[in-house]
A protein has these predicted regions:
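Short internal beta-strands
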Residues: 29-36, 216-220, 351-354, 373-382
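C-terminal helical cap/extension that packs against the catalytic core
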Residues: 43-49, 364-420, 455-457
Length: 457
């Protein structure tokens, strides 16, 4: 990163603030720019000012910065076709993502995980596995702190488990992780990427710069992701829960098996784990691949897996009320994630709460499963009318429209009885009602616990 030209970090969220702080710590003149008014922590503002930078707000400020800056660092929430991004490119600035910045500042090892669903669970498991190595490790990216901030204290021999979204992978040019994982690809974020092709191209950036010294881990069971094996220059490792692989990570009779260079090693059996659902089997397979190529022992990987509990907001058990279990799956921000949640409950009888900020993805595949698995579908949020139309078209019975989030939970409680389960799995982002999916999930849990305590009728 040049010390001659100023750097603009676009977006004052978690990633943007982290990137700006790291650059300022390295004595780089950096301006944190935001379209709307915002307030910085006094310590961060003083740090930026100490290197000749600061906080910039509004269009006029942005355009003036283009005269002194050579690099524009994008926070994940800033789209590549944003007018200011295009203007910066026209003015000759190099535009990179916060992940690319972090990679350039870090010389250590990275296991990078992307995919439409399963990223957080897989990355969290990998992070626990990396802790078993005799070197420092951390978890960052789309989970926890900004990647550039997380790697600041890691040494050259350290390991980072990085969860990466398609947004974070849009503007990378030299990013080359030691291990690159693609879990799956299904429609998501089409309001930003516009087409599945563009969405997939962003995901591929995770392995584009890899060579023979790196490993590309792909889901053999995903028909799209499987074909990407022909495009990587890294060593290819497939994982599969359906096929026995001569070279790769697979399942057989419930066992997770590593087959590599003619040797087979069993890590553990699915019956030993606290995770359930086919999607989690895929997550475990991918995590085993990461652990294996990072040098984690079989016994350590097995121990991590046996002790790992489901992450918060992903099919998270909340409470049992009158024999009816309630589950929080607020992290299901797209239809495929909700499909995986529905499939995890093999007996069906689900009271499903869905809806929120509409991502405009196709609904028919999900609604076909909703018709099969649910006893009632409760719709809420900005997406409820489109969801209702799709559900009716697919013949889903017992559709209920809720006036609010609270009304949806109350209606679910009124309808539910043994042997049913109540599942919040919105298939939508949360931005119509909440700051993010954790806030939505925590509010759901609060309402359920109030019902459990008899405080809400």
């Amino acid at each position: 990163m040049t010390k001659k030209d100023a750097v603009i970090v676009y977006g004052a969220g978690i990633s943007g603030r982290g990137a700006a702080q790291v650059l300022a710590d390295k004595k780089q003149q950096v301006y944190l720019y935001n379209d709307m008014d915002c307030t910085l922590e006094p310590q961060l503002l003083q740090l930026l000012q100490s290197v000749g930078g600061g906080l910039a707000i509004g269009q006029a400020a942005f355009e003036s910065l283009l005269d002194i800056a050579g690099v524009l660092v994008l926070s994940p929430g800033i789209a590549c076709d944003n007018a200011n991004v295009l203007l910066a490119e026209q003015r000759g600035l190099e535009v990179i993502s916060e992940v690319e910045l972090g990679y350039r500042l870090y010389g250590g090892h990275i296991a990078a995980i992307t995919g439409t669903n399963g990223k957080t669970t897989t990355t969290t498991i990998v992070g626990e596995m990396l802790k078993r190595l005799p070197v420092p490790s951390a978890v960052g990216g789309n989970i926890g702190l900004a990647l550039s901030k997380e790697v600041e204290s890691l040494p050259q021999d350290g390991w980072l488990a990085a969860e990466l979204s398609s947004f974070q992978l849009e503007k990378v040019s030299s990013f080359c992780p030691d291990i690159a994982v693609v879990l799956n690809l299904t429609p998501d974020h089409l309001e930003r990427h516009h087409t599945m092709e563009a969405y997939g191209e962003a995901k591929k950036n995770i392995f584009r710069q890899q060579g023979e010294a790196q490993v590309t881990v792909l889901n053999y069971d995903d028909p799209i992701v499987r074909t990407w094996g022909a495009e990587t220059k890294g060593r290819l490792c497939y994982f599969s829960r359906k096929e026995k692989l001569q070279q790769g990570i697979y399942m057989q009779d419930g066992n997770f098996i590593i087959s590599w260079d003619g040797k087979q090693k069993t890590v553990c059996n699915i019956s030993e784990l606290h995770l359930f659902g086919g999607h989690n089997e895929e997550n475990v397979l991918a995590a085993i691949a990461c652990g294996f190529f990072a040098g984690v022992s079989i016994s350590d990987m097995a121990d991590v897996l046996r002790n790992f509990k489901s992450i918060e907001h992903r099919i998270e058990y909340v409470a049992d009320i009158d024999g009816v279990p309630y589950y929080n799956d607020s992290k299901a921000t797209n239809t495929d994630s909700t499909i995986k949640a529905l499939e995890a409950f093999k007996d069906g009888h689900i009271i499903l709460l869905a809806g929120g900020h509409d991502k405009l993805t196709p609904l028919e595949p999900m609604m076909e499963l909703v018709k099969e698995k649910t006893d009632a579908l409760i719709l809420l949020g900005a997406a409820k009318e489109r969801f209702n139309k799709a559900a009716v078209a697919c013949g889903v019975p017992n559709i209920v429209l809720a006036d609010s989030f609270e009304d949806a939970v109350a209606k679910a409680h009124a309808l539910a009885h043994k042997p049913q389960v109540v599942l919040l799995s919105p298939a939508c982002s949360s931005f119509d009602m909440f700051k993010n999916y954790p806030e939505r999930g925590n509010y759901f849990k609060k309402l359920v616990h109030e019902l459990e305590g008899g405080n809400v009728k």
